[in-house]
């Protein structure tokens, strides 16, 4: 997945978070960062660049990757490898793919810097993370990756491997 730092028309730094279409087979209606599977012969970095282009119409070269966050292993066994990229492009120029993106949100630094919630559940010894975003809660894995991005920006070395997904995402 990719957190790509862009800007608004007035120059405010933001990054896009998407909401998946309700008709999607996997995780319909959930919040997500651009990303997907690595194709044969492709590196994780190349996949991140390709998925960003396919989902949002943003063509950012691999050289614009400025960092990597911790891998997050989902309950279903997928390994999510998050990258942080710098684009600097106007987020208003996005061209979302309607097959993969129902809506795009521009996340500001003020929205990013909201304290996450950590909820105890009977099914796991690890806390479920809930990142409050506008009128919603974004859970792991997306919420965990965004949480770590916030922590890194604040100079904290916080790991996310012990942050749980909600039970509804365990499939």
Residue ranges and their predicted role:
Residues 141-144:
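Intrinsically disordered, low-complexity, charge-dense segments enriched in Lys/Arg
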Residues 1-33:
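N-terminal strand-loop-strand
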Residues 146-150:
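Short, amphipathic alpha-helical segments that act as regulatory/interfacial helices
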Residues 37-134, 138, 151-152, 156-171:
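Unchanged
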């Amino acid at each position: 997945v990719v957190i790509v730092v862009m800007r608004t028309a007035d120059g405010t730094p933001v990054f896009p978070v998407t909401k998946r279409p309700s008709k999607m087979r996997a995780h319909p209606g959930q919040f997500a960062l651009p990303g997907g599977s690595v194709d044969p012969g492709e590196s994780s970095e190349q996949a991140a660049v390709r998925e960003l282009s396919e989902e949002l119409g943003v063509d950012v070269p691999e050289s614009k990757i400025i960092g990597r966050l911790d891998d997050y292993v989902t309950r279903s066994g997928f390994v999510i490898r998050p990258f942080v990229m710098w684009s600097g492009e106007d987020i208003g120029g996005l061209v979302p793919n309607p097959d993969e993106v129902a809506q795009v949100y521009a996340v500001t630094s003020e929205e990013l810097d909201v304290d996450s919630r950590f909820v105890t559940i009977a099914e796991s010894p690890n806390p479920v993370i809930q990142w409050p975003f506008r009128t919603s809660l974004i859970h792991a894995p997306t919420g965990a990756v965004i949480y770590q991005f916030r922590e890194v920006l604040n100079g904290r070395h916080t790991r996310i491997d012990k942050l749980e997904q909600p039970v509804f995402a365990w499939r």
